[in-house]
Amino acid sequence: MNEQGEAINSSAESRIQLESSWKAHVGNWLLRPEMRDLSSFLRARKVAGVSVYPPGSQIFAAFEATPFQRVKAVILGQDPYHGQGQAHGLCFSVRPGMPLPPSLLNIYKELEEDLGLLRPDHGCLLPWANRGVLLLNAVLTVEDGRAGAHQGKGWEGFTDHVVDTLNREREGLVFMLWGSYAQAKGKVIDTRRHLVLKAPHPSPLSAHRGFLGCRHFSLCNQYLSQHGLGMVDWSLPPCIALDGAILNGRIAV
């Protein structure tokens, strides 16, 4: 990271910048020594020929898709999918055309049970992000076939700062915390200012313990409506109707 709040592109020589509204609120964190160390680490992994996901231009895609003042709800994930072609910078989301991961299938099951919305034919959650749902992983990069490979390298401090900044500088947001990891990360959230919804992780290993049936999507909209932020449209268009201009840009592919 440098003085411009930029991150090294892990798949090319170019640099990318944090979206301007986020840079104004959290960009100073990118100047910290641990973020410079992270930048050096990512550069070294690239030089070593390691495949790092998502591509560099999509590392900050969650912020690009959901500017600071447009955030209504936050879904916290752990780290990106580690299979080739899956991750594109939004937690739980995969690029159009990729098979649906098991956790996302359970999210869609709950969406249908809660709101009656039929499962889409793709796993791209970019429409949610564009409507104000920050889809934030705690760790923003991973290596091919190695889940958690970049944990403890510096991303957690940055994303903790993002959560804390939203907690302090915004009001009336909904934080959807699925699983113990997300719930630990969300301990700083002031429940007098925001709604915190907790459930087990949607993984097949735990979804039956309370994620399925949690009704978080309708509870989120009920709270947002009561606090004047406007409800989230949780519907997802069919793959053929996704905005090709967006999907061919830096965020989704």
From Swiss-Prot:
Entry keyword annotation includes rRNA-binding: no
Sequence intervals crossing the membrane: none
UniProt key word Hydrolase: yes
Superkingdom classification of source: Bacteria
Reactions performed catalytically: Hydrolyzes single-stranded DNA or mismatched double-stranded DNA and polynucleotides, releasing free uracil
A Pfam match: UDG
Localization in the cell: Cytoplasm
Active-site annotation: 79 (proton acceptor)
Top-level class of the enzyme under EC nomenclature: hydrolase
SUPFAM superfamilies in the cross-refs: Uracil-DNA glycosylase-like
GO biological process annotation, one example: base-excision repair, AP site formation via deaminated base removal
EC numbers: 3.2.2.27
Function: Excises uracil residues from the DNA which can arise as a result of misincorporation of dUMP residues by DNA polymerase or due to deamination of cytosine.
Family matches, as NCBIfam families: PRK05254.1-1, PRK05254.1-2, PRK05254.1-4, PRK05254.1-5, ung
Family indicated by similarity: Belongs to the uracil-DNA glycosylase (UDG) superfamily. UNG family.
PANTHER family: URACIL-DNA GLYCOSYLASE
Name of the protein: Uracil-DNA glycosylase
